[in-house]
């Protein structure tokens, strides 16, 4: 399995491998499995460019997992998405001689990447730094903007959250299972001699505080304000924003909005319009995390942070896709003094970042040099909520 930066052109690597195999055996059959229609279309274009359609076919995993096939080489793009009870059957349904898995970030929050490793060990890993050094990606600098604001509401939510969380012995899995599964909750109450009605109230109060606390940091109005400031200072750039929700993406109010509530045809038109403009803004929630190829992107703004290395790697990859002479910027907006910084630290995939405040942001946007700082790269935060 190839473990590489999302934008280090995993597709090109796979195409090179297919070409080598075809030279040795012109009758070789390759099945390429992808998670989305967008990626299927991108692969099709690459296969046409390289005259490989006679040896290869592409299927979306939802369909591929239902149809037994025999192939010489099975390629699974974005293989980190396979470890579900349904999709993992792909390894049994498809009979293959060789397996190539492609991913930008294998590590998952649920640890289920271990299931993938049963079928495919990591054969190579390309870091962002190595990819940049070899000219496979464009240089990208991340600015982590620490935003100061009134935390009275957050601190009150945090206090209540911790009070409810202590009821579950500070065990995140127990608390979350109690929310999701009433049968688990009943069993847990019985085993611990707890009142079911009281446990139910604690469960939903804990979940409510968890949601409100996350909403406070990820959808804070000051992030919208600062995102607009960055956009106005980079009017000559192609800019992609990542928000927590569709509503937040729409609140930015500058440029285009791409989201799942619009029809596929509408989104295709919006994306095509954005691609053809020399400078523009595309606001998204999660719709551009995977499968969007816009090498001309020069600026990204992340308004919504979580602990996922996969999501961070995907978003990083959107920005540093290679384009001659390009130097990209990524602005990650964080509410200072909250757990959001811990989420960012757990998700970071590169050492090429600086931590700045709002005054330093103004200097950067004006093109001035700044004194910056980094955190200890060996430090670790074990909790993710």
Model-derived regions, located:
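Conserved interdomain hinge at the start of the Helicase C-terminal
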Residues: 17-18, 156, 162-163, 211-251
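Walker B catalytic acidic pair
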Residues: 77-78
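A short beta-strand element within the Helicase C-terminal
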Residues: 72-74, 283, 290-306, 311-312, ...
